Amino acid sequence: MRATFHLFTFIFLLLFSSVICISTPGFRNDHESIGDDEEKTSSTILVSTIDGRLRALDSETGEIKWTLQEEPVLRSPSAVKQGFTFLPNPLDGSLYVLKNSSLKKLPFNIPQLVHASPCKGNDGILYAGSKKDVWFGIDPKTGLKVETLSSASADRICPANQKQTIFLGRTEYRVSMFDEKNRGKTWNATFNDYSAHLLPEVNTWPFKHYASSSHGYILTFDRETGEMRWEQDLKQPVVALYLLRDDGLHKLPFEVMGKETMENVAKNIFTVDQWPTVLGVNAADPQTTSLTNQFFPALFVGESSFGLYAIEALVDHQTITYSPKLLGPPLLEGPAPIALTEMEKEEYLPPRRPIIRNIPPSITHKTSDGEYLLLGYHDRPMMTMATIIPTRYPVPGPHKAIGSTIERPPPQLLGPVEPQKHEDTSFILLLLNNHPIPFYATLVTMFALLLTVIWQCGRQWDQQKSTSRMDSFEIVNNPGESRSAQTSKQSNRGSFGWANRKIEIPEGWMAVGSKLMYSPSDILGTGCEGTVVYRGTFDGREVAVKRVVSEFVKFAHREADLLRESDTHPHVIRYFCMESDSQFRYLALELCIASLNDYVEQKEVQQNVTIALRDIMKQATDGLAHLHASKIVHRDMKPQNVLITMASQRGEMRAVISDFGLCKRVQPGKNSISRGIASGLAGTDGWIAPEVLISASTSYPVDIFSLGCIFYYVLTSGTHPFGKSLHRQANIVNGEYTLNKLADLDDWSLADDLISSMLNVEPLHRLTADAVLNHPFFWTSEKRLAYFSDVSDRVEKEEDNSPVVRRIETDARIVVCGGWREKICDALKEDLRKFRTYKSFSVRDLLRAMRNKKHHYRELPEDVRQSLGDIPDQFLHYFTSRFPRLLLHVYKATEYCSGEAVFKRYYSDDVRARMYPIVEEEERVRKKIKEEMANEVWARAPKPVEQRTPLKLDKRNIKKKSNPNTD
């Protein structure tokens, strides 16, 4: 009954206030008077730029409707004077003074100086100012100026239409400054401001605007969805935004950002999922932004056609700013800074940004007496202690007779400006004056609603209090119902029931679902967007519980689906289940002891990990190869996402790939992922491949690039191939990296070749995951020795001019260090002379010697065996330590034979596919040359002598001739 009574009471008050609001004549007339014209007007915003133009833009599309040219907002000198240069801010008229090449902010602005003038500063500066007000009416549809009203005269250009004409008020402030000691030093400025500050600022505006500091580039976002609505380039710095309504201008808030920062935002806005949150849109509280965490305040000093100016703007960590500490002469060393740990520095100190140490002459204003000004971004200056004393005072009441004493208030110093906080009050007073009855009706409704909320909270408190008296509790959920987290509130232990099954919950733990529990106090790690990883249990097994905010439930489900498909591989983190409550999603994952980043940075972790470093690298590559074979691109490979599991019952540890939150599947029939709004710019700064930033699509090579950075990071104990974090991503885009620290490794040539191939700027030229696994860097000693023997057998009987022999003997003297006989020990040298002759500069003969000594190892003299060491490790190291380029050289040369059955286990399919057309072409050329040579030999061979048949003689004729006397 009580609940029904309160409900009916609340509904009655709500209906009563609504009827009063609707029946109010003023309220109804105001709303009826709002026709199509006002709706069109309210959707128009006016953008004021420094050159004096007022542009009307459509608030939905950003399309320019019309332009009105007025006087420039700011006119100031463009020259720099010693000790007498002021930089005005065109946004609010605040002033900055340049002294000794250092900027300081004055505690007053131009309008305040004009109101207080004539006045004198404590630094000897004399101030004089004037003010001029003017009203002008415009047609909101065309922007045509209809009428001008001022104290001097009233000009009417065309007949004014009271229904359509909107009057805008503008105030012109002129201020002059004089040095009382030096009359040659003067400074003048004119500042124009519109009268929008007299009306309440629109706080419920559905859009959020950002403007650049040095040109008129504007970005507009939807506050609720975070979607970018439109962009516009006005070519001149923006100084103010107004909402155009029938009652005048309403000032709109906007953020000023650096030009380079705006370009980065515009370039990445469709690819970075985190930009809406970074920019402060699509948040629970629109006024609460994370700009201070991502951007930093700075002062931009610029130059326009109307003089020098300064605007406070937000910049990112890549923007170079000038520090006043480095622009002046060297100073005495100050006190030592407070000693802070690295963790305290990250928590309390802002991140460093680059500082210009040399003055670029192209952006410097200099004077003959040594004063100079740098155009660009400066560290936000400190405020000076300057004050001004007014020289005249308002006289209260009527004037007294001549000779009487006028009581004047004591002089007051005009110091730092305190922000006026009367906007809310003026807005409430405006509602009360224009619509009193709806105002009071709204108050009554809010009061009734407050009583209802208090009553409902009290009722829930009573129910919770009665529930807390229970000794234990059970939850029985049917399949398909939503699961919620529960925890026991008993002193020692509670019980948790699921389908009448009781599970004990340790004190301080939380239970989600039937089998999953976690400890909120035992945090294993944190991620972006509120993701936290806790230690927990799943069905009695220790697991890591990853908690994801419900707003990102789509990503949590996608991660769970990808894990279900890929966690059968031993080097992909195992997935157990996913539970949910009203606020979060919980993923139960395999518990690991450390990440690869912990392994590199913490020595105690290295002592507890039993797996070799090279095995960690190979297993991580194996897991990545499995993902790529499953058509999955990880997109966030970094040392923190390569984990080392707990030791198994056999004491074995494994390296696994984790964090599938940014993974994407390559669709069937495609080879890449398009970079759209849904896909976004994925990855972690410093580990992102260059094509992610500059290409329209990405694919598997992005993971290979990140893995190459990880390899170098691990092999060099924490060094990144692209340098320090500040310039790392820029170096990645430019392809500037160094691998000089690999020279300390025994296999430096193999490591250098592997990582260089993985960091290639061209994605198509990078190795695949299978090719990385087949690289000789990961071969065991047995496999390397067997490879040398197989190559030696292959080229033993080959002719010297055969393709494979020519490849092996190319640059042979570099490979064998001039002559390999000079690098081996005397015992082995003498043993080689006993059997056959070897060429000291031939790689093929070196391989033959290694093969023969390996096959006849037991027959070698004792001193030779001691020099060579045991097979395979010491024997192999004997030769590779003397000839470090040998294995890589032979591996590259013998790619020609990768398609042969003997070498298929040494090369990946990618190498065979790459070499197949080369081998085919070379074989075709060889065959053609042989045919031409055969034809040439046949053509040059001597012709055989013709054999003539002997003549048969007639014996009868011979007889006749021999015996002529016969007859």
Curated annotation (Swiss-Prot):
One of its GO terms (biological process) is nucleic acid metabolic process. It catalyses: L-seryl-[protein] + ATP = O-phospho-L-seryl-[protein] + ADP + H(+); L-threonyl-[protein] + ATP = O-phospho-L-threonyl-[protein] + ADP + H(+). The active site is at D636. InterPro entries: IRE1/2-like, KEN_dom, KEN_sf, Kinase-like_dom_sf, PQQ_b-propeller_rpt, Prot_kinase_dom, Quinoprotein_ADH-like_sf, Ser/Thr_kinase_AS. Residues 479-494 have a biased composition (Polar residues). Its cofactor is Mg(2+). ATP binds at L524, G525, T526, G527, C528, E529, G530, T531, V532, K546. Disruption phenotype: In combination with RNAi-mediated knockdown of atf-6, causes sluggish movement, arrested development at the L2 larval stage, and lethality soon thereafter; larvae have intestinal degeneration and develop many vacuoles in the intestinal cells. In combination with RNAi-mediated knockdown of pek-1, larvae have intestinal degeneration and develop many vacuoles in the intestinal cells. RNAi-mediated knockdown restores fertility, reduces the accumulation of unspliced tra-2 in the cytoplasm and suppresses germ line masculinization caused by RNAi-mediated knockdown of rnp-4/RBM8A. The modification Phosphoserine is found at S672. Gene3D superfamilies: KEN domain, Phosphorylase Kinase, domain 1, Transferase(Phosphotransferase) domain 1, YVTN repeat-like/Quinoprotein amine dehydrogenase. It holds the Pfam family Pkinase. Residues 474-494, 948-967 are annotated as: Disordered. Its main location: endoplasmic reticulum. Changing G723R: In zc14; loss of adaptive protection conferred by non-lethal hypoxia treatment. Prevents transcriptional up-regulation of apy-1 upon ER stress. Reduced UDPase activity upon ER stress. It comes from the Eukaryota. The kinase domain is activated by trans-autophosphorylation. Kinase activity is required for activation of the endoribonuclease domain. The keyword Signal applies. Keywords: ATP-binding, Endoplasmic reticulum, Glycoprotein, Hydrolase, Kinase, Membrane, Multifunctional enzyme, Nucleotide-binding, Phosphoprotein, Serine/threonine-protein kinase, Signal, Stress response, Transferase, Transmembrane, Transmembrane helix, Unfolded protein response. Its EC number is 2.7.11.1, 3.1.26.-. Residues 518-778 form the Protein kinase domain. Residues 22-438 are lumenal. The chain crosses the membrane at residues 439-455. Belongs to the protein kinase superfamily. Ser/Thr protein kinase family. This is Serine/threonine-protein kinase/endoribonuclease ire-1. It comes from Caenorhabditis elegans.
